Amino acid sequence: MMKGAMGCPVAAVMEGSFSCTVANRFYQLLDDESDPFDNLREAERCWQQRKNLSKVVARRGDPGSRGCATRRELQKQRKQLGTPAPPPQPGQKQAPKQEECGGKDNSRAEKEHKTAWRPSFMEYLSSETESQAELTAQSLFRPTAKLNYERPRGCGRGRGGMQGRGRGGGINKSFDGFDQRGKREFGRQNDNDKIEMELTAPMEATAKTAKSPGVSEGELLNKVAEGKPREEVVQEMTLDEWKNLQQQNRPKHEFNIRRPESTVPSKAVVIHKSKYSDDIQKGELEDDYHIFRRAVNDITFQLDINFGSLPRPGCGSRGARGRGRGRQMEETGPQPEAMVQIVAPNPDDPEDFPALT
């Protein structure tokens, strides 16, 4: 049951008849003829009037607001000028002035210079084509860091590897462990210098030997080759080019493979010759090839299998067991000699197996 405005007669009738009332939340629409949009339009009109009034007041200018603005400007000027420092006491050391260490203006200028000086990787990659004289002049004759007496007094060495006062002064400083100045480039130039020195040495040796009479050109080449080993010049190439170069320089293996020959060489010796190889005719092989097939090294047909020499076991040979029917060995007479059976016929022999016509 919702609580409604009991003063309203409609609410009292609804509560008496239906035991519940529907109350107006804002208690503004007390009659059915009033429109809720009228209230919204009235509120919007009042808000617009207040807005216009505030604009008019801002144009005319409030003397109180002007006074507040002037006070704020005066406070900003006082902060910029700064309060005068108290006179130094005799027992205390005087702090360094802002003019000596640079000040805020100098720090801003250093930041701008820092951002302008910061190099990129592409610049150093493109600088590989510079001349050797400029690199040697920069690396050898340019001081890497200022000496202690050259630094201004009171301005310590700060962090970072940039130029400027109070922040250290080295171009050779590396960024996050990586030297962007082109260290490998300078090393590469040194390698080139070494290679040039080594190349000029054998050239001088060849010039001296050329002056001496009675020396052939082959001996000169041998002397140059016997000298110091020549270092290979570093070249830039892709992986595919390097693989192709390795394939070209790789020696080719030549195998002496003997081709199969149908004829038997004259120096060949027959170790084992088959017994029936001469008796077999080619025609019979072609006719019986699909019926009988035997391996070349099959020796089963050469064995003589004879089962007549095996002794037969007796019933009582294991002793007098059971009812005593076992026979003793003395009772048996002398056994006759084993009969030799005839060798099995040879299937390949036409006499043993004549062809059926």
From Swiss-Prot:
Residues 96-115, 176-186 have a biased composition (Basic and acidic residues). One of its GO terms (biological process) is ribosome hibernation. GO terms for molecular function: ribosome binding; RNA binding; translation elongation factor binding. Residues 155-171 have a biased composition (Gly residues). Keywords: Cytoplasm, mRNA processing, mRNA splicing, Nucleus, Translation regulation. Residues 56-116, 150-186, 313-357 are annotated as: Disordered. Residues 348-357 have a biased composition (Acidic residues). GO terms for cellular component: Cajal body; cytoplasm; cytoplasmic stress granule; Gemini of Cajal bodies; nuclear speck; nucleolus; nucleus; sarcoplasm. Its main location: nucleus. It is found in: Nucleus; Cytoplasm; Cytoplasm, Stress granule; Cytoplasm, Sarcoplasm. The C-terminal region is necessary for nucleus and cytoplasmic localization. The N-terminal region is necessary for nucleus and nuclear bodies localization. Belongs to the SERBP1-HABP4 family. Associates with ribosomes; promoting ribosome stabilization. Interacts with EEF2/eEF2; promoting ribosome stabilization. Ribosome-binding protein that promotes ribosome hibernation, a process during which ribosomes are stabilized in an inactive state and preserved from proteasomal degradation. Acts via its association with EEF2/eEF2 factor at the A-site of the ribosome, promoting ribosome stabilization in an inactive state compatible with storage. Plays a key role in ribosome hibernation in the mature egg by promoting ribosome stabilization. Ribosomes, which are produced in large quantities during oogenesis, are stored and translationally repressed in the egg and early embryo. This is Intracellular hyaluronan-binding protein 4.
